[in-house]
Amino acid sequence: MTSMENITEVTEFILLGLTDDPNLQVPLLLIFLFIYLVTLIGNGGMMVIIFSDSHLHTPMYFFLSNLSFVDLGYSSAVAPKMVAALQSGNKVISYNGCAAQFFFFVGFATVECYLLASMAYDRHAAVCRPLHYTTTMTTGVCTILTIGSYTCGFLNASIHAADTFKLSFCGSNKINHFFCDIPPLLALACSSTHISKLVVFFVVGFNVFFTLLVIIISYFFIYIAIQNMKSSEGRKKAFSTCASHLTAVSIFYGTIIFMYLQPSSGQSMDTDKIASVFYTVVIPMLNPLIYSLRNREVKSALWKILNRFYPASFSVSRK
């Protein structure tokens, strides 16, 4: 029997998680369970608010509702398994389960890149061409941008999933991470990963820098338009409509670039884990807060919904 015949392909993986310290398992369980529940309530609530208030049926909120759905999607691809592993101690994930988690996480995360770019284009149209806004951001344009975002996202996920899971995993099946992400999976492969790493660098690089370029160009023209406004009130209003989006963009792209586009020799897996926690579970929780805390229209719509179900309590509390 040859040595090649003795090689056994991996049929399941073990997710090592954030830490193996038993004293930290319960605190981490409570923290991530809380974060995930806030994510579900925040993003689910944002979608309900937008769909239930006709005043929010505008391009900006159409994109925002899709962003909430996407945040739910890629957070749900990771958080439930992580919480279950912390609760039960069972860190095993099947090969197919790992591939599915990988596919949906990469897909939804890439969709978010393109949605953020679409939202920047929408803000550019609103600030730079307000008189033509309704003819620029039509229902058809918004639909095309959204469908294009999902298409690019899951096309990207298909490329990475096919490229990663064609590799041979015949050695250790212990993934030094809390979910099936690209870097730790490539580290486990027993076949050459040179081509796969090039695919990651160039495909992720294209998606990130193309969408980031759209955002930068949009905000360059937005900045010029704001500087040319004579009214300080107009400047303040224009800036406030963009501030939330800029905050979300900065946090999201900062962590994505740190994770996937720096030289592999310049990062440790533990550092990767910390960054991964941020963009897999923290950012989806923060986005609805970022977009709602300074948004009067969302707050007003929320009060209307609460007043509809609890008229006595909330009519008094608003006075």
Swiss-Prot record:
Topology, Extracellular side: 1-26, 77-100, 156-197, 260-272
Gene Ontology MF terms: G protein-coupled receptor activity; olfactory receptor activity
Membrane topology: Multi-pass membrane protein
Record key words, sorted: Cell membrane, Disulfide bond, G-protein coupled receptor, Glycoprotein, Membrane, Olfaction, Receptor, Sensory transduction, Transducer, Transmembrane, Transmembrane helix
Residues modified by glycosylation: 6
Domain of life: Eukaryota
Keyword Transmembrane: yes
Biological processes annotated in GO: G protein-coupled receptor signaling pathway; sensory perception of smell
Role summary: Odorant receptor.
The protein's name in its UniProt record: Olfactory receptor 5B21
UniProt organism field: Mus musculus (Mouse)
Gene name tied to this protein: Or5b21
